[in-house]
Amino acid sequence: MSAAVMRSRAASPPTLILYHAECADGFGAAWAIWRRYPNAEYRPVKHGEGPPANLAGHHIGLVHFSYARPTLEAIAKDAASLVVLDHHITAEQTLADLPYAYFDQKKSGAVLGWEWAHDEPAPWLLRYIQDKDLWDWALPNSREISAALASYPFDFQLWTNFEQQELEREGRAILRYENELVTKLASHATLVQFEGAT
């Protein structure tokens, strides 16, 4: 089932999006949905923490993240609706049979979020996030764009204004600086013996 089919099954637009915190792919998924549904509430969530309070009655989207099955089932029971968009194999192995869960390991959370919310192909920014998140590194200047993106805060308006060539330029400088630091640190390395081996 495609993300677009999942969207067509949604009873109403989302009122609350929960996305993986401190992660470009998680925020990219939230940004993708925000581009279509700017009036929803967007909350970052972290692994190892329980879901936020006051989820009852919301039309919830959970992107690039999922909770344990009992937690998801409890959320689904109280929510007006729930959709889970994820690409992690561990979550898919335990949640794939849930009618509100959609998984695709060949796509990033950001691209899944875009495909769920939009009919047109994902924009360049999300394709680059996917290239890094899936460790493909197939797009030109992908490492540069990834380095530049990591230097910015997670802000919807800011991300909307990114330009590809500018991120490439910034990323080249960041990678050059990182490589120089590594070279300097490596020049001070000394061999030591550890448990009889060098």
Give, region by region, the residue ranges found by the protein language model:
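A charged, amphipathic alpha-helical module
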Residues: 152-198
